[in-house]
Amino acid sequence: MFSIRIATVVLAASALLAAASPITNTETPVNQCGSGSIQCCESVQSASAAQAAGILGPLDILTNLQGLVASHCSPLAAVGVSGTSCSSQTVCCKDVSKSGLVNLGCSPINLNL
């Protein structure tokens, strides 16, 4: 009987210690842009959309892409600085082509600017 009580106390103590252990947050905050660059773009659409094909075709960019294509973009270099804003779609793009005219491999992000 005594051994059952000891086992119960040890089990309860172990559960409390596990619950009290610090947990490290490994999630990347939404406003960070991994290996790409943060851009403010006038237009963001699926690479398979007809509008994207119309933009990519004349620029000799492959039209069998997947993901999002952003166009008419400008970099947001100083995120969080007073006066920095984007009235269009903020995206994180891995490939900035044609001086921001077309950006490939984009993901929408929310910077709360």
UniProtKB/Swiss-Prot annotation:
Protein name: Fruiting body-specific class I hydrophobin fbh1
Family indicated by similarity: Belongs to the fungal hydrophobin family.
Keyword Signal carried by entry: yes
Cited SMART domains: HYDRO
One Pfam assignment: Hydrophobin
Role according to the record: Aerial growth, conidiation, and dispersal of filamentous fungi in the environment rely upon a capability of their secreting small amphipathic proteins called hydrophobins (HPBs) with low sequence identity. Class I can self-assemble into an outermost layer of rodlet bundles on aerial cell surfaces, conferring cellular hydrophobicity that supports fungal growth, development and dispersal; whereas Class II form highly ordered films at water-air interfaces through intermolecular interactions but contribute nothing to the rodlet structure.
Signal peptide positions (record): 1-20
Subcellular location per the Swiss-Prot or TrEMBL entry: Secreted; Secreted, Cell wall
Disulfide bond sites: C33-C92, C40-C86, C41-C73, C93-C106
UniProt subunit comment: Self-assembles to form functional amyloid fibrils called rodlets. Self-assembly into fibrillar rodlets occurs spontaneously at hydrophobic:hydrophilic interfaces and the rodlets further associate laterally to form amphipathic monolayers.
Transmembrane helix recorded as keyword: no
Major subcellular site: secreted
GO CC entries: extracellular region; fungal-type cell wall
Phenotype reported upon loss of the gene: Leads to retarded growth and displays denser aerial mycelia. Slows down primordia formation, leading to fewer primordia and subsequently fewer fruiting bodies.
